């Protein structure tokens, strides 16, 4: 179910403050966050945000095509290593 249009998109307050502070200073720093549920808003375009995937922070550069998506969509949490090469040995 999508979020109601009557409500604003969710962005964590601490993340919004950091983005606004960097926009006023016109500096580029990596913003570290654990908030995967935050929505990407137009003021964050051009920033690099390090999103936590459960193990480490992955730096993601925000572009205009990412606006409206959640931060967690760009930091995968699972790492599929592939199926076993030869399954016949384990069946014997």
From Swiss-Prot:
GO terms for cellular component: chloroplast; mitochondrial small ribosomal subunit. GO terms for biological process: ribosomal small subunit assembly; translation. It is found in: Plastid, Chloroplast. Keywords: Chloroplast, Plastid, Ribonucleoprotein, Ribosomal protein, RNA-binding, rRNA-binding. Gene3D superfamilies: 30s Ribosomal Protein S19, Chain A (3.30.860.10). One of its GO terms (molecular function) is structural constituent of ribosome. The keyword Ribosomal protein applies. Its main location: plastid. SUPFAM superfamilies: Ribosomal protein S19. Pfam families: Ribosomal_S19. Protein S19 forms a complex with S13 that binds strongly to the 16S ribosomal RNA. This is Small ribosomal subunit protein uS19c. It comes from Nicotiana bigelovii (Bigelov's tobacco).
